[in-house]
A protein has these predicted regions:
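Exposed, low-structure sequence patches enriched in small/polar residues
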Residues: 1-237
Length: 237
């Protein structure tokens, strides 16, 4: 805790060499090199009208390379009935392992953006409007393929399939919700949901997708686009 109820948090960790089977989804275990992680976070007094946070962190990937994360957030409370949270995280991934089926893993370098916000407005006693939004955009470049050996062990490289496995990925979800508290444990909800998953494999010579275009493609043609009305009613005393 710093003066003025500000906070500074530091962390450091070490991982020994070990076997791992999470990324392979149970299709064999492979050796992960020794590595570690560190993080630093600075946050201002959350009780004030404006509060901020800034964070940095790094983690070593399973077979080499460091991935770095940068995040920032702001919380605004202009008056008691309204609160707004805005957050942005960027990750620069180097050596990211992605499951490719059977006992195969792909190694990728990737840039990842994750903006989000959450807005709450208590319009009147018993009436609340909430809007939250989350998006993740990933642009990944393939750096090699590996296979888990029979009987587990160290990953072995696979040749002959490089150059056509880059991909873009976008995940979007947003919800606007109105809640009317009619009585204790009796509520009426009106909810709008919109969500989409965009995934595109890139071939040789395909242009790199701009982050704005990736967001637009994630927003267009949603797989979820619905209004829901719900009444929760309490029977009895």
């Amino acid at each position: 805790m710093l003066p003025g109820r500000n906070t500074l948090r530091l962390g450091l960790g070490y991982f020994p060499e070990r076997y791992e089977d999470i990324e392979s989804r149970g299709n064999g275990a492979y050796i992960v090199e020794a590595g570690g992680w560190w993080e630093a976070l600075l946050a201002t007094d959350a009780a004030k009208m404006f509060s901020f946070s800034i964070g940095l962190s790094s983690v070593r990937e399973p077979i080499g390379g460091w991935s770095h994360s940068y995040k920032a957030g702001v919380t605004i409370r202009p008056f008691d009935a309204v609160s707004m949270d805005f957050n942005l995280q960027y990750r620069d991934r180097n050596g990211w392992l992605v499951y490719q089926g059977d006992q195969d893993l792909g190694r990728f370098d990737a840039s990842e953006w994750q903006p989000s916000f959450d807005i709450n407005w208590f319009v009147a006693p018993g009436h609340q409007v909430r809007w939250n939004f989350q998006w993740a955009g990933v642009r990944a470049v393939e750096r090699g393929f590996y296979s888990i050996p029979t009987g587990d062990g160290k990953l072995s490289g696979i040749t002959g399939i490089r150059g056509t496995n880059d991909f873009d990925l976008g995940l979007l979800t947003t919800q606007i919700r109105y809640r009317w508290e009619i009585a204790p444990l009796t509520d009426f909800y009106l909810v709008y949901n919109r969500g989409n998953t965009y995934n595109e494999a890139l071939g040789l010579g395909d242009p790199k997708t701009g982050i704005g275009d990736l967001f637009s493609r994630s927003y267009e043609k949603p797989i979820i686009d619905s209004f829901v009305a719900k009444l929760r009613y309490r029977f009895g005393n």
